[in-house]
Structures are given as C-alpha cells and as structure tokens.
C-alpha cells in the first residue's frame, strides 16, 4: 500500500490531535484533586425568600459537586418558621456545611448557625440572642419561648454542641450572646476568620481549593 500525501498528513495529525485532547483534558484531571466550596450568602432577614435562597443554594451546591457549603451569614433574625425550615434543610444536607458569621447571627440566625457542621466567625461578630419577640420587639409568651428552646437544644445535640449553651441564648431573663472568643471557649466556634477565603483555607488544610459563589449560578428565574 502506497500512502498518498493526504494519508501522510492524516497520520501526522493523529498524534497532534491526541496531544491537544490530552492538554484540554488535563485541567479536568487536576480539578479532581481540588476541594470545592460552594458559598451561599445570606445577608437579610430570615423569611420565606431567604428560606428559598438557602434551599436553592443547597440544590445548586449538590449539582456542582461541592465538597463543602459555606453559609456566609449576616442577619438579625426573622421568622421562626422560615428559620426552622432552613435548619431542617441544613441538618438533612449530606455534605458538611460551614457557617461563616460575617458580623451577626442573632436570634433565628443563631439557630441556623448551630444547624451547621462547623462555625467560623469574623472579628467583631456575635452569635446568640435567640429570644422570640413579635414585630414590635416585645417578648412573646412562654409557649413560644419553650418551642424555640426545644429547637435550639435539639439542633445543638444534632451537631454535637452543648445544648445548655444553645438554650441560654433564649433565656428571657439573661439572654446569651457571644463574641468569637467566647464562642470558641464553649465549642460554638472553630476559629476566627476575616473572609470566606480564610474559612476555606482552614477547612481545606493542605489541599488546594476553589470557592464557587451561588451568585454566579443564579439565572433570572432564580432571582424572581
């Protein structure tokens, strides 16, 4: 068999194309060794819209194959029923969820933080003050407080934390709110970090990592 000039060109192209395909696929192999963090930013009152945001974020994190979720949290609280739904979703989620208290995790925000597998806090931030109040700021009856106390205790137990500390956050007589240092002392904070990058760095340890932001995955339908 005598090769034509076309055959020679084709034979030469095959190893070149194979090499190009290898180079293109190389980042995919490299990415397998990366620890993937998926960041959900919750910087608002806890209500049905924030409940939908967190639920959607967890779904997107799972679709992205994330190893960890970072819940970047800054809230003074909100509706107890919405907080309970978020809490339940976090406890059900199969991969580890890291709460990053990016200034405030008050009231319902404290409950949500405690539902996460680990908690990191920013300098100057606080967690606690989970007494149930109405829209005017008046303390609700003991029936409502008892429900919140039970949720705080059970959530702390589910994530391996002291339930008495969680319950103290709902004490109407002497409500507990903690700084990062105070939270570390009682096992309610793993460390102080100034950014979500520092959080990922501490959690990943020696492994390389990448942070994916939920905002980058949001479609116009998601934002409705």
Please report, for each region that a protein language model flagged, where it lies by residue:
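Sec-dependent signal peptide recognition
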Residues: 13-22
């Amino acid at each position: 068999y005598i090769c034509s000039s076309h055959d020679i060109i084709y034979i030469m192209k095959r190893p070149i194309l194979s090499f190009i395909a290898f180079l293109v696929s190389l980042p995919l192999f490299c990415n397998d060794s990366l620890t993937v963090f998926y960041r959900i930013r919750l910087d608002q009152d806890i209500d049905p819209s924030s409940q939908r945001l967190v639920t959607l974020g967890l779904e997107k994190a799972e679709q992205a194959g994330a190893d960890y979720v970072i819940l970047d949290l800054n809230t003074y609280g909100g509706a107890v029923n919405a907080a309970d739904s978020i809490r339940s979703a976090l406890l059900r989620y199969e991969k580890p969820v890291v709460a990053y208290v990016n200034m405030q995790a008050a009231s319902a925000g404290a409950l949500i933080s405690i539902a996460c597998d680990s908690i990191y806090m920013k300098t100057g931030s606080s967690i606690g003050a989970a007494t149930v109040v109405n829209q005017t700021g008046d303390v609700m009856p003991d029936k409502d407080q008892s429900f919140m106390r039970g949720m705080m205790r059970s959530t702390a137990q589910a994530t391996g934390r002291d339930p008495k500390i969680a319950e103290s956050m709902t004490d109407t007589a002497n409500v507990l709110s903690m700084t990062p240092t105070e939270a570390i002392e009682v096992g309610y904070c793993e460390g102080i970090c100034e950014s979500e990058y520092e959080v990922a760095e501490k959690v990943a340890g020696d492994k390389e990592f990448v942070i994916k932001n939920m905002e980058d995955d949001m479609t116009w339908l998601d934002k409705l």
